[in-house]
Each structure stands twice: as C-alpha cells, then as structure tokens.
Amino acid sequence: MSVNEENGAGKDASRANAQWGGRFAGGPSAIMQDINASIGFDHVLWRQDIAGSLAHAAMLARTGIISADDEAAIRRGLTEIGAEIEAGRFDFSTALEDIHMNIEARLSDRIGEAGKRLHTARSRNDQVATDFRLWVRDAIDGLDAQAASLMRALCRRAEQHAADPMPGFTHLQTAQPVTFGHHLMAYVEMLGRDRGRLADARRRLNECPLGSAALAGTSFPIDRRMTAAALGFDRPTANSLDAVSDRDFALEYLSALSIMAMHLSRLSEEIVIWCSAPFAFVRLSDAFTTGSSIMPQKRNPDAAELVRAKIGRVTGALVGLLTVMKGLPLAYAKDMQEDKEPVFAATDAAALSLAACDGMIRDLTANTDRMRAYAGSGFSTATDLADWLVRVLKLPFRTAHHVTGRLVGLAESRGVDLSDLSLADMQAEEAGITQDIFSVLTVESSIASRTSEGGTAPDNVRAQAARWLAVLENGA
C-alpha cells in the first residue's frame, strides 16, 4: 500500500477541499490534514467501498437518478480502480483524507463527469457505515472458519486421548482424575459458544445503512432494498439517524472477540504450563518454540505466550471503542473515525491467535505416561472414596466427606497414598468399610465411573468429539 503524503499533496488537498469546501475560503493546514486523514488505515476497506459504490450506482440507474451510460462508466471505472489497488499500483493520498475520497477522485479522473454523479443521494456517513459493516461481516466469516478449524483439531486430539488420564485441577491443585481428551473438549465447547456469539453479532449487523445519507435520509427516489439485497444484507436499517451514528455492531463484534481471545489465552496458558519442566505433559516441536540467546538448553513456548498476551490488544480495542462512543450525541461526529483501527488490530490479533493455537494443537505431542503418573497424585481419588461411603454404606455425604478427610490426613501424615492404607486403618475411621473400597481408588476406576452426561468417562469423550465433528462436517 502506497500512501502519498508529500508529492502532489497541495493539489490533492485542493481536490479534497472541492469535495466539501464550497463554503470555505481557504484549505486545511498540514496539521489538519494529518489529524483528519484516515487513509493510513481505512485503505483496507477498498473492496467494501467499491462493492458499495457499484450497488449504489446500479440502484441510481435503475431508479432513473443517473443514466445507464453513467452507470456503465462508473462500473467500468470502479472495476479498473479495483484492479489497480489489487496490483499495488494505486497511490493513496493523505490529502484526500480517506478511502472514499481517494477512490472517488480517481474515478472522476478516469471517467470525468459521470464519476461526480456517483455520490448522488449518498453521504460519507452512510457510505462508511456500510463499508464498515461489510468489512466486519467478512471478518466474522473468516474468524468463524478459523475457529471451526481449531475445534476440529481439538476434537481429533480428544478422540486420540479419550482414555488417557491426566490430573484435573482446581486452584491449580490436583482435584480429580480426568482424561486429556475430556480436558481438550472443554475448549471445543467454549469455542462453540464463541462462534455462536459471532454469529449473533453477524445477524444483528446485517442491515444496510446505505441510503440514510448524512442523517435524515434523502429526497431522491432511491430503492434502499435494492442496494441492501445487492450487498447481501437482510434489510435496510430502519432509522437513518441510528444507521449513521452507532457502532454497536463493531462493539458487539469486539465483545465476542474479547471472550474468544480470553479462551485462547487460557488454552495457551495451559500449554505453557504443560510444556514446563515440572509438568512436562506435552512437547511442542521446533515449529512453535524458540530458544534463548544465552541459555542453549532452552525451548520456550513463545507461540503460546504471545497468544496469551494478545488478548490485551483485543480487550483494549473494545474498551477503546466504548470510550470513543460513550459521550457522542447523535448523529455522526469525527470521533467515530477512530472506530476502525481498533477493530482492524483486534481482528488481526484474533486471526493470528487462532492460527497459532490450531497449529500448536496439531503439533503437540502428549506425554501420556507423565500425565498418568500425576493423575493419581494429591489424593485425587478421595471423592471416589467419599462417594463409595454414600453409595454402599448409605452415609450422608457430609459425614462421608469428613471420614474421607480424616483418612486423607492419615495418609498424608505417613507420606503414602490412600490406596496404601490398610483396611484396618480405614475401618478405624468407619467400621463398615470393606475390602471393596480399594477398587474405587484407582485412577482408571475413577475416570470410568464418571458416566454422567458431560463427564470424563472415555465413552462420553468419544461421543462428544464425534458429535462435534459431525456438526462441523455439516458446516455448522
């Protein structure tokens, strides 16, 4: 992308002034041009801007507002401009402020008076609102596809490790045994909800502002439903003031993105922990690790650490845009020019984070022996003992909890596991305990017993993964 900040800037400033400067005696200062220009970032809207202009021109011709010849010239000119931008031959000018005026000025250069008719019954207010909605809609579709890919990777890993034990944690302390597959499927559920939130945001944003003009609509006999349909919107927006003055569609998108980034950050944090030497549950290949400039032995999980950090960009974008919008009276204010950069940056961060997580999940090697060894540590089957007391001896759960707690204390004082206590030790706390108690104290027994819906039993994990893979295969 080439942005022309100096060469011809005076000429371009005059041309920009010609777009809106009829009542001005002089042009903007260099500082005013710099602070006013958004072309440095909104050039990414060029595809959406051209698409919106093509739909608008077709509607103007259909309704008799411009001639068919003018519409044909506009279509030809915009198509050629699109090819120029695609090929990197378009010089964007800071003096022309934004993507809209850059394209319009170039169009007028190419086709003359017909290009100046394009902006009939349109304002930059409804133009940018339309472009931005189109861009966010495209971004949602792209991120949704990436999230679905990550979900598939997680499901396939979960199937592979549906029966491989690992410690489940609360407070990062050993709690109960689960399977690695069950743990991974938790993130599939989170990502499924993330995609649902993005889909909800997409549905609400899919109304077309074009035709709202500056804020009050237009006196020209336009057909807003025609342009809405041409651009893939469900309907035109219902209120012209609302259409040009709100960015809640972008805020909702950033909110959904922030929640998804938080989930990716949590997954990445766990990968960092699992890769650490004290855990050593998984290993990432050289493709997703880096070394140290001084310590030759180091293999750092930098990809995971960077994903963990990128949530700051995404949530920062949400807070930033909320702050921009919170005090604005209706309708449009120039403050709203600051809406796009945070959305673009957050989208880039989310896309890169999804790609990195997808790559890491497909790349990692699970150390199942290490996980299995730790799965039984920290008295992780204590709840199984308490459940046995309730189920077999009919003790109230709170009583069983206290009995089990005393047995844990005894085992801990001796430096042994629960299963290393003798039957006599256990009967000293609860006389009704029999030899059968030891059968529930194994990791495998604990995991196999968790057959409740959503539980960690291997068959549950396999069924959950298969269900999600079927859903994803059907494009949902």
UniProtKB/Swiss-Prot annotation:
Superkingdom field: Bacteria
Tagged with keyword Amino-acid biosynthesis: yes
GO molecular function: argininosuccinate lyase activity
GO cellular component: cytosol
Membrane-spanning intervals of the chain: none
Enzyme class per UniProt: lyase
EC number: 4.3.2.1
UniProt KW Transmembrane helix keyword: no
Pfam family, one: Lyase_1
Subcellular location: Cytoplasm
Biological processes, Gene Ontology terms: arginine biosynthetic process via ornithine; L-arginine biosynthetic process
Record's keyword terms, sorted: Amino-acid biosynthesis, Arginine biosynthesis, Cytoplasm, Lyase
HAMAP family: Arg_succ_lyase
The family this protein is said to belong to: Belongs to the lyase 1 family. Argininosuccinate lyase subfamily.
PANTHER family: ARGININOSUCCINATE LYASE (PTHR43814:SF1)
Name assigned to this protein: Argininosuccinate lyase
Organism: Gluconacetobacter diazotrophicus (strain ATCC 49037 / DSM 5601 / CCUG 37298 / CIP 103539 / LMG 7603 / PAl5)
Record gene name: argH
